[in-house]
Amino acid sequence: MPWREVQDVPRRESTHIQSDLERKIDLIDKTVGFAVCGSFCTHHKAMEALEQVKARFTHVVPIVSECTADTDTRFGKAHDLMREMERICDHRVISTVKAAEPIGPQKLLDLLIICPCTGNTLGKLANGVTDTSVTMAAKAHLRNSRPLVIAPSTNDGLAASAVSIGALLPRKYIYFVPFGQDDPERKPTSLVSDFSLVADAAQAALEGKQLQP
């Protein structure tokens, strides 16, 4: 057998082994919270983002707002959404203020993602209001000086919620998933994050960096 053919066989095996090692190295050993608010029309994209986050980090804890936990819409049933989140994460959903509070004192998360984050939740975060499971999770998490990543989805992002976004942008430990207008003609004030960038934004935040559009 020619020398070149002999060398080809171990080279292919070596490449396969290296690929497996790379996949293990790429999995980041961090615990990430993934909180979903009631922007129901974007929940399908949020689930895609959750899949990508779970593929990037070793542990993911699902969290939903009370509105999300209790509301069935034309976009789907609340129960089905929560079961899907539990399937992806292999972890029970946190859906109450009481269940979210230990995130702080027990330092349960390395990073928290809110995806999607509604205008209502943006306003509460900007003004220190803690009356939902998601805002409690955020407050409890931030007390540990750990990163919070926000993926806005709101029809008034360039109207009433612009004030909230502006207040949160310069705050320490808060990062945003890159966002922009989703329908300038029919909804000129609406802003939605690029959900395909959620995992990248999370990884950047762990390094103290804001992912740029």
Q: Residue locations for each model-derived region?
A:
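A cross-family phosphate/adenosyl-ligand binding-site feature
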Residues: P2-L148, S153-P213
